[in-house]
Amino acid sequence: HNDGVCVPRIRKLMDWSEYLQTLGEDSILLNPIFESDNHGYDTRDFKTIDCRLGTNEDFKEVCEDLHKHNVKIVLDGVFNHVGRGFWAFKDVQEKKWDSPYKDWFHISFDGNSCYNDGFWYEGWEGHFELVKLNLQNPAVVDYLLDCVKMWIEEFGIDGLRLDVAYCLDHNFMRRLRSFCEELKPGFALIGEVLFGDYNLIVNDEMLHSCTNYECYKGIFSSLNCMNMLEIAHSMNRQFG
């Protein structure tokens, strides 16, 4: 739960930057750091560091310190959904049909939510504390790209890990790829992918890489059982 108390915990990363450099680590991946309702994946504001971690200025100093030690920063980009406390969704809760943000989400005013909002909306995989964004709405895409631009220009981040990338609109990922490459050449996009054909989103137009859970599972299962059938099947399915 977000208690609203500001504690600069994120500054502790500066205690480890020299050690990371000593290890030869050249990048660090952070879980969601922006203001959220609870655990970080339920974002309230993409432009403000969560007060439980500190302030924007705290994170800016952390990024400068990590870069000084040749460590790049990859943030968790949670673009599929937001929290119920997200500013645009709160506007819809208040104004209903009259909200200019009602089309930012997948909403039906013919139903009701489990929170009795007076309208139904799509949550991520049935989790209604995670309100699904409408990534086919140009206004939503423009807003998210503006946030990414701010992260690059203000903090100097070097890449994004896209949460539940298998749920993201493909045209959105194409737009994000070209936008980031133009803004910062070499910017990395890594997708969280659980299943399916990874080649659909890991290509020259969308993501550079992804989390290959299928092969990860195949590797440890095959090695533990001393039976290479599972990893051979996964490798052949993906790359054969």
Label the predicted regions.
Residues H1-K72, V82, W87-D91, G126, ...:
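N-terminal structural segment of carbohydrate-active enzymes
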Residues Y19-L23, D65-V71, A88-P100, W104, ...:
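An active-site-proximal structural segment forming one wall of the substrate-binding cleft
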Residues I28-L30, I73-L75, L160, L189-G191, ...:
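Hydrophobic faces of well-ordered beta-strands that scaffold small-molecule active sites
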Residues I28-N38, G77-F86, D163-D169, E192-D197:
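Short, solvent-exposed turn/loop segments enriched in Gly/Ser/Thr/Pro and often Arg
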Residues H39-C51, F79-F119, S178, D204-E214:
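Aromatic- and acidic-residue-enriched segments that line the glycan-binding/catalytic groove
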Residues H69, W87-L130, G218, S222-F239:
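Core domains of carbohydrate- and sulfate-ester-processing enzymes
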Residues K90-V92, K96-W97, M173, R177-G240:
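Conserved alpha/beta catalytic core and glycan-binding cleft of carbohydrate-active enzymes
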Residues Y121-N199, I219-F220:
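Active-site neighborhood of glycoside hydrolase catalytic domains
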